[in-house]
Amino acid sequence: MILSLFGYGTLEISLVMEAVTGKSFHSTGAVLSDHARFLLPGETYPGIFRDYGSQVTGVLYEEVDRDSLALLDLFEGDFFRRERVQVMTPSQPRVDAYTYVVPAEHRLLFSTQPWDREVFILLHLKDFLPYCREFHWSQTRRLGMGLSSR
C-alpha cells in the first residue's frame, strides 16, 4: 500500500523530514481545506485543527513507507493524532493522505499566532535538525530498524 503524508509545519521542510526518517521522499505542494495552523504556546512548531473555511498550505510526501510512518508517529508524540485527510495538489483535486492533527479537546491550547515557515528556518532550523537526527538515530536503534540480522 502506498502511503502519502501531508506535512504542514516543521515536517514540510524536507531537511526535517529526512532527518527524522533517514529517507527522502518525492514531494509536491498541497493544500488542506477546513483546517487552521497556529503556533503552540512556548513552542517553535505549529499544530493544526479543524476550522471550516480555513486552509493550510504544506507539502504532500509520496510513497512513505510504514517504518518511516512509525518513526513519524513517535516523533509527533501523544499530543498529535495521525488522521486521514484529503488534500489538493496542483495536479490532483483530491489525494488521500495522513497528517498530524491536534485533537479538538486541545484546541484552546493554541496561541493566536500563525506559524511562519521562513521565521522557523531563519531562527530555529539550525538547532532543530540535530535534535531530529538524534531522534532518528536513537529510535531506529531502539526499534531495530535498518539493522541487518546476523
Report the location of each language-model feature.
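Glycine-aromatic micro-motifs
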Residues: 1-150
